[in-house]
Regions:
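Thr-Gly-centered strand-to-loop micro-motif
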Residues: 178-179, 207-208, 214-215
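Loop/turn positions that initiate beta-strands
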Residues: 207-209, 225-227
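Catalytic-core "active-site belt" of small-molecule-metabolizing enzymes
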Residues: 6-187, 192-194, 201, 221-225, ...
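C-terminal terminal-subdomain/extension
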Residues: 2-4
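Extended mid-to-C-terminal alpha-helical interaction segments
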Residues: 199-203, 207-208
Length: 243
Protein backbone atom coordinates (compact mmCIF):
# COMPACT_ATOMS: atom_id res chain seq x y z
CA UNK A 1 0.00 0.00 0.00
CA UNK A 2 1.30 3.46 -0.88
CA UNK A 3 1.59 5.91 2.00
CA UNK A 4 0.20 9.22 0.78
CA UNK A 5 -0.02 10.88 4.20
CA UNK A 6 1.27 14.44 4.43
CA UNK A 7 4.22 15.27 6.69
CA UNK A 8 3.13 15.65 10.30
CA UNK A 9 3.72 18.78 12.35
CA UNK A 10 6.96 18.30 14.28
CA UNK A 11 7.10 19.12 18.01
CA UNK A 12 10.55 20.53 17.29
CA UNK A 13 9.21 23.22 14.97
CA UNK A 14 8.41 25.80 17.67
CA UNK A 15 11.80 25.46 19.43
CA UNK A 16 13.56 25.72 16.06
CA UNK A 17 11.61 28.87 15.13
CA UNK A 18 12.29 30.43 18.54
CA UNK A 19 15.99 29.65 18.26
CA UNK A 20 16.13 31.28 14.81
CA UNK A 21 14.28 34.39 16.00
CA UNK A 22 16.46 34.81 19.08
CA UNK A 23 19.64 34.24 17.10
CA UNK A 24 18.72 36.32 14.06
CA UNK A 25 19.18 33.24 11.88
CA UNK A 26 17.12 31.94 8.94
CA UNK A 27 13.94 30.16 9.95
CA UNK A 28 13.85 26.37 9.82
CA UNK A 29 12.24 24.68 6.86
CA UNK A 30 8.49 24.12 7.05
CA UNK A 31 7.67 20.63 5.83
CA UNK A 32 4.13 20.18 7.16
CA UNK A 33 1.01 22.04 6.05
CA UNK A 34 -0.73 23.80 8.95
CA UNK A 35 -4.21 25.11 9.53
CA UNK A 36 -4.56 28.60 11.02
CA UNK A 37 -5.43 27.04 14.39
CA UNK A 38 -2.31 24.88 14.29
CA UNK A 39 -0.17 27.85 13.27
CA UNK A 40 -1.48 29.91 16.18
CA UNK A 41 -0.63 26.99 18.47
CA UNK A 42 2.94 26.90 17.17
CA UNK A 43 3.20 30.68 17.53
CA UNK A 44 2.09 30.56 21.16
CA UNK A 45 4.79 27.95 21.86
CA UNK A 46 7.35 30.15 20.06
CA UNK A 47 6.35 33.19 22.12
CA UNK A 48 6.53 31.18 25.33
CA UNK A 49 10.17 30.43 24.51
CA UNK A 50 11.05 33.92 23.25
CA UNK A 51 9.23 35.83 26.01
CA UNK A 52 8.64 33.59 29.04
CA UNK A 53 7.99 36.74 31.10
CA UNK A 54 4.92 37.50 28.99
CA UNK A 55 4.15 39.79 26.08
CA UNK A 56 4.51 43.55 25.85
CA UNK A 57 1.80 43.69 23.24
CA UNK A 58 -0.06 42.21 20.29
CA UNK A 59 0.36 43.17 16.65
CA UNK A 60 -2.03 42.82 13.75
CA UNK A 61 -0.82 41.78 10.32
CA UNK A 62 -2.45 41.26 6.92
CA UNK A 63 -4.73 44.16 7.74
CA UNK A 64 -5.59 45.25 4.19
CA UNK A 65 -7.61 43.46 1.49
CA UNK A 66 -4.55 43.51 -0.79
CA UNK A 67 -2.28 41.75 1.72
CA UNK A 68 -4.97 39.21 2.57
CA UNK A 69 -5.57 38.48 -1.11
CA UNK A 70 -1.83 38.05 -1.69
CA UNK A 71 -1.64 35.37 1.01
CA UNK A 72 -4.98 33.75 0.16
CA UNK A 73 -6.74 34.54 3.43
CA UNK A 74 -9.85 36.55 4.29
CA UNK A 75 -9.02 38.00 7.71
CA UNK A 76 -6.19 39.68 9.57
CA UNK A 77 -3.70 37.71 11.67
CA UNK A 78 -2.12 38.37 15.06
CA UNK A 79 1.37 38.11 16.49
CA UNK A 80 3.03 38.80 19.82
CA UNK A 81 5.34 41.66 20.79
CA UNK A 82 8.18 40.49 23.03
CA UNK A 83 9.28 43.02 25.68
CA UNK A 84 12.91 43.14 24.58
CA UNK A 85 11.90 44.10 21.03
CA UNK A 86 10.27 47.39 22.10
CA UNK A 87 12.53 50.41 21.63
CA UNK A 88 12.19 54.17 22.10
CA UNK A 89 12.16 56.70 19.28
CA UNK A 90 15.53 57.51 17.66
CA UNK A 91 16.90 54.09 18.55
CA UNK A 92 19.80 52.87 16.39
CA UNK A 93 20.04 49.34 14.97
CA UNK A 94 22.61 47.64 12.72
CA UNK A 95 21.55 47.07 9.12
CA UNK A 96 20.16 43.65 8.25
CA UNK A 97 19.51 42.55 4.68
CA UNK A 98 15.90 41.80 3.79
CA UNK A 99 14.36 43.76 6.63
CA UNK A 100 11.18 45.79 6.03
CA UNK A 101 9.86 48.90 7.75
CA UNK A 102 6.22 49.77 8.43
CA UNK A 103 4.49 52.88 9.77
CA UNK A 104 1.93 51.89 12.38
CA UNK A 105 -0.30 53.31 15.09
CA UNK A 106 0.32 51.97 18.60
CA UNK A 107 -2.56 51.87 21.07
CA UNK A 108 -3.33 51.18 24.67
CA UNK A 109 -6.92 50.22 25.41
CA UNK A 110 -9.32 49.91 28.33
CA UNK A 111 -11.00 46.72 29.49
CA UNK A 112 -13.68 47.12 26.83
CA UNK A 113 -11.15 47.38 23.99
CA UNK A 114 -11.54 51.14 23.50
CA UNK A 115 -8.46 53.29 22.85
CA UNK A 116 -7.20 55.28 25.82
CA UNK A 117 -3.77 56.28 24.47
CA UNK A 118 -2.05 56.42 21.11
CA UNK A 119 1.55 56.71 19.85
CA UNK A 120 3.37 56.91 16.51
CA UNK A 121 5.34 53.76 15.79
CA UNK A 122 7.60 52.01 13.34
CA UNK A 123 7.90 48.26 13.02
CA UNK A 124 10.85 46.36 11.64
CA UNK A 125 9.87 43.06 10.05
CA UNK A 126 12.18 40.26 8.96
CA UNK A 127 10.74 37.52 6.75
CA UNK A 128 13.82 35.33 7.07
CA UNK A 129 12.58 32.13 5.42
CA UNK A 130 15.21 29.62 4.38
CA UNK A 131 13.13 28.68 1.31
CA UNK A 132 10.95 30.99 -0.77
CA UNK A 133 8.40 28.19 -1.07
CA UNK A 134 7.86 28.34 2.71
CA UNK A 135 6.42 31.86 2.45
CA UNK A 136 2.71 31.42 3.10
CA UNK A 137 0.19 32.70 5.62
CA UNK A 138 0.30 29.84 8.11
CA UNK A 139 4.09 29.56 8.17
CA UNK A 140 4.36 33.32 8.59
CA UNK A 141 1.81 33.16 11.40
CA UNK A 142 3.72 30.38 13.15
CA UNK A 143 6.87 32.52 12.89
CA UNK A 144 5.12 35.43 14.63
CA UNK A 145 4.52 37.40 11.41
CA UNK A 146 8.21 38.24 11.14
CA UNK A 147 8.02 40.73 14.03
CA UNK A 148 11.53 41.93 14.88
CA UNK A 149 11.44 45.36 16.58
CA UNK A 150 8.90 48.00 17.54
CA UNK A 151 10.05 51.63 17.79
CA UNK A 152 7.65 53.83 19.76
CA UNK A 153 7.12 57.56 19.96
CA UNK A 154 5.36 59.17 22.90
CA UNK A 155 1.92 58.00 23.95
CA UNK A 156 -0.75 60.69 24.21
CA UNK A 157 -4.22 60.39 25.74
CA UNK A 158 -6.67 59.30 23.07
CA UNK A 159 -8.41 61.99 21.03
CA UNK A 160 -10.94 61.34 18.29
CA UNK A 161 -8.85 63.30 15.78
CA UNK A 162 -6.21 60.55 15.94
CA UNK A 163 -8.57 58.37 13.90
CA UNK A 164 -7.89 60.41 10.75
CA UNK A 165 -4.14 60.96 10.92
CA UNK A 166 -2.12 61.44 7.76
CA UNK A 167 1.22 59.62 7.99
CA UNK A 168 4.46 60.20 6.10
CA UNK A 169 7.85 58.46 6.22
CA UNK A 170 11.15 59.92 5.08
CA UNK A 171 14.55 58.28 4.58
CA UNK A 172 17.48 60.69 4.86
CA UNK A 173 15.02 63.51 4.27
CA UNK A 174 13.42 62.01 1.15
CA UNK A 175 9.79 60.80 1.23
CA UNK A 176 9.45 57.03 0.86
CA UNK A 177 5.95 56.29 2.15
CA UNK A 178 2.64 57.97 2.88
CA UNK A 179 -0.56 56.64 4.31
CA UNK A 180 -3.34 57.20 6.79
CA UNK A 181 -4.22 55.79 10.19
CA UNK A 182 -7.40 54.28 8.74
CA UNK A 183 -5.42 52.19 6.22
CA UNK A 184 -5.18 49.42 8.83
CA UNK A 185 -8.44 47.72 9.81
CA UNK A 186 -10.45 50.89 9.29
CA UNK A 187 -8.54 53.04 11.78
CA UNK A 188 -7.50 52.96 15.44
CA UNK A 189 -10.96 52.97 17.05
CA UNK A 190 -12.29 50.10 14.97
CA UNK A 191 -9.03 48.13 14.97
CA UNK A 192 -8.73 48.26 18.77
CA UNK A 193 -11.97 46.35 19.23
CA UNK A 194 -11.24 43.92 16.40
CA UNK A 195 -7.77 43.09 17.70
CA UNK A 196 -8.96 42.62 21.29
CA UNK A 197 -11.83 40.38 20.21
CA UNK A 198 -9.64 38.21 17.98
CA UNK A 199 -6.88 38.07 20.61
CA UNK A 200 -9.28 36.60 23.15
CA UNK A 201 -10.50 34.03 20.65
CA UNK A 202 -6.90 33.07 19.84
CA UNK A 203 -5.86 32.64 23.46
CA UNK A 204 -3.60 35.63 24.05
CA UNK A 205 -3.29 36.82 27.64
CA UNK A 206 -4.94 40.25 27.62
CA UNK A 207 -3.03 41.82 30.49
CA UNK A 208 -3.37 45.55 31.33
CA UNK A 209 -1.09 48.02 29.53
CA UNK A 210 -0.56 45.85 26.47
CA UNK A 211 0.58 47.70 23.36
CA UNK A 212 -1.60 47.05 20.32
CA UNK A 213 -0.04 47.59 16.89
CA UNK A 214 -2.81 48.08 14.35
CA UNK A 215 -1.04 47.21 11.08
CA UNK A 216 0.83 48.89 8.24
CA UNK A 217 -0.28 52.34 7.10
CA UNK A 218 0.67 53.03 3.50
CA UNK A 219 3.28 50.79 1.91
CA UNK A 220 5.81 48.41 3.44
CA UNK A 221 9.28 49.52 2.31
CA UNK A 222 12.80 48.02 2.48
CA UNK A 223 14.75 49.18 5.53
CA UNK A 224 18.01 50.67 4.23
CA UNK A 225 20.90 52.31 6.07
CA UNK A 226 20.25 55.87 7.17
CA UNK A 227 17.78 57.89 9.20
CA UNK A 228 14.03 57.35 9.07
CA UNK A 229 11.48 59.76 10.44
CA UNK A 230 7.74 59.21 10.40
CA UNK A 231 5.34 62.11 10.93
CA UNK A 232 1.87 61.45 12.32
CA UNK A 233 0.46 64.99 12.32
CA UNK A 234 -0.86 66.08 15.72
CA UNK A 235 0.23 62.74 17.23
CA UNK A 236 3.89 63.62 16.74
CA UNK A 237 6.73 61.72 15.14
CA UNK A 238 9.05 58.75 15.61
CA UNK A 239 12.55 58.22 14.26
CA UNK A 240 14.96 55.34 13.71
CA UNK A 241 18.63 55.10 12.73
CA UNK A 242 19.91 52.10 10.75
CA UNK A 243 23.71 51.88 10.79
Amino acid sequence: MTNNSAPKLSPQLAPAIASAILGGAPLPTFDATMTLDEAYGVQHDVLGLCAPEGLAGIKAGMTTPASQSFFGIDKFLLGGICPKTVQASCWAVPFRAGRLIECEVALRVDGEGRPIACAPALELVSLNFARETDMNATNLLAANLGAEFIVLGEFQPWRDEFADLAISLSHNGMPVNSGAANDALGGPSLSAGLICSEARVRGYDMTPDLILMTGACGQVVPAEKGQYEAGFGVLGSVCLHIN
